[in-house]
C-alpha cells in the first residue's frame, strides 16, 4: 500500500502486544497475591497428600528438592538414584483446579549434575523445564495456574531426558476438579519404572546406569515405587 509505513505499524503492534502481555502478567500476579497461601504437604509414596476440601482457589507453594541418593534397589544391590524429594517416584503434588502454584525447585549442592522439572499440568512448551534448569547449589522458582483437572506426570527434562527419567526423576501432579472428587476408603500412589544396571538382576554391590541396555529397551529391573519388594511383605498395601 502506497504511503503505508509497515515498519512503524509492526513496531506499534509489537508495543501493543508487549503492553497487553505485561498488563496480563501484572493482573495475574495481582490476583494471585490476594489468594490465601498454602504450603503443599509432601509425603513419601505410596502415601499422598490428603484430598482437598476447600471450595475456593489458593496460592499453593510447593518446595521440591532434587536429590541424588545412593540406596538399595534390591537386597544387596545399590544404585545411584536421581530423585525429586529423595523418593522414587517423586512426591505427589496435589492442587485444585484454579489454584496458582508457586513451585520452588532446589538442586542440592551435594549433587553432581544440573536438573529441571517438566510438569505436564503446565500449559505451554516445556512445562517449566526452561525456567527451572539449575546447577547444583541453586534454586529456581516459577508460577503457573492449574487450568485443567486431571492426573499428570512430571519429570526431569534435562538432556539426555531418558537417562534422567530412567534414574528415577518422575512423579505425578493431581489437579482436582473444582467440584472435588468422590470419596474413597484409601488412596495409594504407585508408579512403575524401568531401571537399567550394568550388572545382572540382583548382582551385589553398587551398580551403574547402563546406557546400552536403555537404548535397547532391556531393563534389568521393572519396579513399582523404585525398589524390589517396595510394595510387598511389610510394605503391602491394604484394602
Predicted regions and their residues:
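Bacterial N-terminal signal peptides that target proteins for export
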Residues: 2-12
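Acidic-aromatic/histidine active-site loop/patch
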Residues: 186-238
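N-terminal pre-domain segments of enzymes
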Residues: 30-63
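Boundary at the C-terminal end of the N-terminal hydrophobic targeting segment
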Residues: 21, 26-33
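Histidine- and aromatic-enriched segments that form or immediately flank copper-ligand environments
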Residues: 61-175
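Short, glycine/small-residue-enriched coil/turn segments at secondary-structure junctions
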Residues: 53-55, 88-101, 232-239
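Bacterial N-terminal signal peptides
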Residues: 10-24
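Low-complexity, Pro/Ser/Thr- and charge-rich linker/hinge segments at domain boundaries
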Residues: 54, 174-191, 199
Amino acid at each position: 500500500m502506497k504511503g503505508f509505513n509497515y515498519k512503524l505499524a509492526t513496531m506499534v503492534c509489537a508495543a501493543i502486544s508487549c503492553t497487553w502481555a505485561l498488563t496480563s502478567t501484572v493482573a495475574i500476579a495481582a490476583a494471585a497475591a490476594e489468594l490465601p497461601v498454602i504450603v503443599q504437604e509432601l509425603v513419601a509414596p505410596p502415601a499422598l497428600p490428603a484430598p482437598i476440601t476447600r471450595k475456593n482457589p489458593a496460592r499453593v507453594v510447593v518446595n521440591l528438592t532434587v536429590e541424588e541418593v545412593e540406596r538399595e534397589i534390591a537386597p544387596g544391590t545399590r544404585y545411584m538414584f536421581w530423585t525429586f524429594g529423595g523418593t522414587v517416584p517423586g512426591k505427589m503434588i496435589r492442587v485444585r483446579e484454579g489454584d496458582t502454584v508457586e513451585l520452588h525447585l532446589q538442586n542440592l549442592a551435594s549433587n553432581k549434575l544440573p536438573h529441571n522439572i517438566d510438569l505436564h499440568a503446565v500449559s505451554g512448551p516445556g512445562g517449566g523445564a526452561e525456567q527451572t534448569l539449575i546447577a547444583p547449589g541453586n534454586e529456581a522458582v516459577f508460577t503457573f495456574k492449574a487450568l485443567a483437572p486431571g492426573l499428570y506426570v512430571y519429570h526431569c527434562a534435562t538432556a539426555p531426558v531418558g537417562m534422567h527419567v530412567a534414574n528415577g526423576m518422575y512423579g505425578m501432579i493431581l489437579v482436582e476438579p473444582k467440584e472435588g472428587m468422590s470419596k474413597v476408603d484409601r488412596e495409594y500412589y504407585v508408579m512403575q519404572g524401568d531401571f537399567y544396571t550394568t550388572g545382572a538382576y540382583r548382582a551385589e554391590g553398587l551398580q551403574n546406569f547402563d546406557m546400552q541396555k536403555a537404548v535397547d529397551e532391556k531393563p534389568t529391573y521393572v519396579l513399582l515405587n523404585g525398589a524390589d519388594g517396595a510394595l510387598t511383605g511389610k510394605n503391602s498395601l491394604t484394602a
